[in-house]
Swiss-Prot record:
Source species of the chain: Escherichia coli (strain K12)
Other known facts: It is missing about 100 C-terminal amino acids compared to orthologs.
Lineage: Bacteria, Pseudomonadati, Pseudomonadota, Gammaproteobacteria, Enterobacterales
Function: May be involved in H(2) production during fermentative growth.
Gene ablation phenotype (knockout): Loss of H(2) production on minimal glucose, complex glucose and complex formate medium. Alters production of organic acids when grown on minimal glucose medium. This phenotype was not complemented by reintroduction of the ypdJ gene.
Protein name: Protein YpdJ
Length: 46
């Protein structure tokens, strides 16, 4: 899957929980219901 560095920036800031299922400590946690594709669509229309 292609990766957008802008998403990496977003993931590192306020959007982090929506794009990642890993905590800031690097622990694997339960996956969020929002997928990456869904999040991208949300950002495009918001």
């Amino acid at each position: 899957m292609g990766y957008d560095s802008r998403l990496d920036h977003l993931a590192a800031t306020s959007w982090y929980p929506f794009f990642n299922n890993v905590t800031t400590r690097g622990e694997i946690i339960e996956p969020y219901s929002l997928t990456l594709d869904e999040a991208c669509q949300f950002l495009k229309i918001s």
